[in-house]
A protein has these predicted regions:
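Bacterial N-terminal signal peptides that target proteins for export
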Residues: 1-8
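Post-signal/leader-peptide non-cytosolic segments of secretory proteins
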Residues: 57-66
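Sequence/structural segment immediately N-terminal to covalent heme-attachment motifs in c-type
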Residues: 21-38
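Short hydrophobic/aromatic patches at helix-to-coil boundaries
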Residues: 99-103
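Axial heme c-ligation environment in periplasmic c-type cytochrome domains
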Residues: 34, 43-54, 67-96
Length: 103
């Protein structure tokens, strides 16, 4: 019984990681790492900084998803987020969900 419960816990953790893993694969596919990193500054803010900035915003995934598609300026000083029109609304939300999950 104990081993069965351990396997159930492991399977549950793997299942929970599934969407985040898929979202990270989208980060790679959409070339987000050309300008951003998980925990180091490159050209734009790193994912941890973004997650911290939007942490208390209840509609953060929607706001960030729109920012990904439309681009923007002024949020991170002189940094410019160029628009990404090739990213669909659903993909932008998935990318935002991943970025916001980074701690």
């Amino acid at each position: 019984l104990r081993i069965t419960l351990q396997w159930i816990a492991v399977i549950g953790l793997l299942g929970a990681a599934g969407p985040v893993r898929a979202d990270y694969e989208l980060v790679l596919k959409k070339n987000c790492l050309a300008c951003h990193q998980v925990d180091k500054r490159k050209y734009g803010p790193n994912f941890k900084e973004v997650a911290a900035r939007y942490a208390d915003q209840k509609n953060a995934a929607d706001v960030l998803g729109k920012k990904i598609r439309r681009g923007g300026t002024g949020v991170w000083g002189q940094d410019v987020m160029p628009p990404q029109p090739q990213v669909s609304a659903a993909e932008a939300r998935a990318l935002a969900r991943y970025v916001l999950s980074v701690k």
